[in-house]
Amino acid sequence: MDEQSQGMQGPPVPQFQPQKALRPDMGYNTLANFRIEKKIGRGQFSEVYRAACLLDGVPVALKKVQIFDLMDAKARADCIKEIDLLKQLNHPNVIKYYASFIEDNELNIVLELADAGDLSRMIKHFKKQKRLIPERTVWKYFVQLCSALEHMHSRRVMHRDIKPANVFITATGVVKLGDLGLGRFFSSKTTAAHSLVGTPYYMSPERIHENGYNFKSDIWSLGCLLYEMAALQSPFYGDKMNLYSLCKKIEQCDYPPLPSDHYSEELRQLVNMCINPDPEKRPDVTYVYDVAKRMHACTASS
């Protein structure tokens, strides 16, 4: 069918709609057992659909990744190994990875559906209303985020892409850390083309210098996120900024202080400890989580 006649008959049904017989023996490991409902997101290398499992009715997010176009064989193997690690994570504040399989020449990842807003939407909402987020609310969400990251780090898994858009908040106020950074598996020629997609406000100095990512790089991002919840913008945000000046600001840890009349010394100090140019001097996630628990307890009761 040519494009024109296709257009006259309305949008084409995605070819991965299940036309196959159900495969109860395969569980979540085949497209035949899912009904695709609608596209809910797209990334640089993937598209995400809301879907329902036809076996048990569970709503899921189905992420389809162009694994063969964008990766070499080693990266594919590493990516699949990493997803197997993610499937072992089991925590109320981490988006659950149910299954992954290759079908129709794509990597399909079946995830818990985070059918709610995310932290970036909440920050925008407060900004629009010209109001700061109350400190007790900051700790209420941040403590859950720390709990999620502590679980991941204790299983030797790094997140690699902590930012407000990847922190989902359910209707009942439960934080779900999602979209774990698999981007590093894509070929360098692909990522080079995308290096300016989404300004890297959360990139640590060691990543700028390509010194590799480690657990302390997640802590840098955690500090940037705590700062953004308080200031309603990234510590390194600037209106008329190019990548070079952003990298300079990050290297020098050049960011405006948080207002001391609105936020506690503890919050401001924790931000400063996490946003430290030397990864060795940043605290580990257990320390950050302990501070968050203490502050959540004392602000929730006040």
Curated annotation (Swiss-Prot):
Function: Protein kinase which plays an important role in mitotic cell cycle progression. Required for microtubule nucleation activity of the centrosome, robust mitotic spindle formation and cytokinesis. Phosphorylates EML4 at 'Ser-146', promoting its dissociation from microtubules during mitosis which is required for efficient chromosome congression. Phosphorylates RPS6KB1. Acts as an essential activator of the NLRP3 inflammasome assembly independently of its kinase activity.
Gene Ontology biological process terms from the UniProt entry: cellular response to potassium ion; positive regulation of NLRP3 inflammasome complex assembly; positive regulation of telomere maintenance; protein phosphorylation; regulation of mitotic cell cycle; spindle assembly
Encoding gene, per UniProt annotation: NEK7
Effect of residue 90 to R/K: Strongly reduced protein kinase activity
Name this polypeptide is given: Serine/threonine-protein kinase Nek7
Effect of residue 96 to E: Strongly increased protein kinase activity
Spans through the membrane: none
Compartments in which it is found: Nucleus; Cytoplasm; Cytoplasm, Cytoskeleton, Spindle pole; Cytoplasm, Cytoskeleton, Microtubule organizing center, Centrosome
Mechanisms controlling activity: Binding to NEK9 stimulates its activity by releasing the autoinhibitory function of Tyr-97.
Organism: Homo sapiens
Consequence of changing residue 132 to W: Does not affect interaction with NEK9
Class in the EC hierarchy, top level: transferase
Chief subcellular location: nucleus
Superkingdom, natural source: Eukaryota
CDD domains to which the protein is assigned, alphabetical: STKc_Nek6_7
Annotated phenotype, changing residue 97 to A: 5-fold increase in catalytic activity
Site entry (Autoinhibitory), positions: 97
List of residues binding ATP: 40-48, 63
Modified residues (N-acetylmethionine): 1
Signal peptide, first to last residue: none
Active site positions, chain numbering: 161
